């Protein structure tokens, strides 16, 4: 199952981008044998004054046809890392070829796009900067693959 992290805004060179690259490289290595990956980041333009509706249109265009859509949203479901790993495995086992993990801009996900999504995931009750959400999501993908592979990265 190919993973597409689709996010508003361009991440400049720096520690966040380096961390994302590191975690997605690790995910590619550990996920391959599990039928997960590769994962890639797709960035859409951050239209400062365009509003969430315009961002949603750009995000929709970046989502592959037929992909399962999971939005990152503070109102979404909070899951443990093992539960998220099992959810990924379940989607993979359903034969889903593509998973779009969608991250909105500073104002979040447009309500209409949220309603269209197959799933809404929250990384906790706190609100996180959308640029950091990418790093946290990339790490959780790697952690999920490690859990599914029985590797010692995740500790209960």
From Swiss-Prot:
Q: Where in the cell is it found?
A: Cytoplasm
Q: Which UniProt keywords apply?
A: Cytoplasm, Methyltransferase, rRNA processing, S-adenosyl-L-methionine, Transferase
Q: So what EC number does this one have?
A: 2.1.1.177
Q: Which GO terms describe its cellular component?
A: cytoplasm
The organism sits in which domain of life?
Bacteria
Is Cytoplasm tagged as a keyword? yes
Which residues are noted in the entry as S-adenosyl-L-methionine-binding? 72, 104, 123-128
State the protein's name. Ribosomal RNA large subunit methyltransferase H
| Species per Swiss-Prot/TrEMBL record | Roseobacter denitrificans (strain ATCC 33942 / OCh 114) (Erythrobacter sp. (strain OCh 114))
């Amino acid at each position: 199952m190919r993973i597409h992290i689709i996010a508003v805004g361009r991440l400049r060179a720096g520690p966040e981008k380096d961390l994302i690259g590191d975690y997605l490289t690790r995910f590619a290595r550990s996920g391959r044998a599990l039928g997960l990956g590769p994962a890639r980041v797709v960035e859409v333009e951050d239209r400062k004054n365009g509003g969430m509706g315009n961002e949603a249109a750009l995000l929709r265009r970046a989502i592959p046809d037929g992909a399962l859509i999971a939005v990152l949203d503070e109102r979404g479901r909070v899951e443990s890392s093992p539960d998220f790993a099992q959810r990924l495995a379940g989607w993979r086992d359903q034969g889903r070829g593509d998973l779009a993990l969608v991250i909105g801009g500073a104002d979040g996900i447009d309500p209409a796009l949220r309603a269209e999504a197959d799933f809404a995931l929250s990384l906790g009750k706190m609100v996180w900067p959308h640029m950091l959400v990418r790093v946290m999501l990339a790490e959780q993908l790697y952690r999920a693959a490690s859990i599914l592979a029985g590797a010692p990265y995740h500790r209960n």
